[in-house]
Amino acid sequence: MFEQTFKNIDDILHKDAGCTSELDYTEQSSWLLFLKYLDALEGDKANEAALEGKPYRFIIDPAYRWDAWAAPKTASGTLDHNAAMTGDDLRDFVNAKLFPYLAGFKQRASGPNTIEYKIGEVFSEIKNKVQSGYNLRDVIEHVDELRFGAQAEKHELSHLYEAKIKNMGNAGRNGGEYYTPRPLIRSMVKVSKPRIGERIYDGACGSAGFLCEAFEYLSSQPGLSTADLKTL
């Protein structure tokens, strides 16, 4: 599912005047994927809190959540085309309101180790390059189809993101310098022999390839207990 969606997104961005390279395709799809994933994560946390009878404070204000500006839904769960922005309205909202709001988290955060600060840092460094709001609407609708609930889906996303980084390198852009092939990662994990309960640190985490392969290595060990699985 992810592979075809990524291809569809790249085809749309290829037609946009503001996106001229593999680097642009990766960057522009990444910030949308980030916001979609963040929205799903907040939804899961809110549901968990509700089951425990606890309140949950959303990081993102209502007007800037995914289901408000990107993909408002009808009562049946389908995209509400009457409420969804498109064209110049969508592009102008993203450029003039969404990005400044998200970048502002860097100043509003309580410290550099908070997720709020990291959101602000990300959106202080990038900008929306998609010039056509209609192209942006099409890309958003493809991103909205993605789901990140299962571990296998997260691993597939990691693999495909690494492939995009590799393509950046093949196209002569410096982003590919930081791509580590999966076979090499697997070999390094096997040599290091991580154990459940140990802290696994990837100091240069990009697509989380090392972390994903460490998880695969640990989860494939024989005789795992319930406590081990909970730790994983």
Language-model features: where?
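Conserved S-adenosyl-L-methionine
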Residues: 175-232
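Non-catalytic, mostly N-terminal accessory regions of nucleic-acid modification and defense proteins
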Residues: 1-196
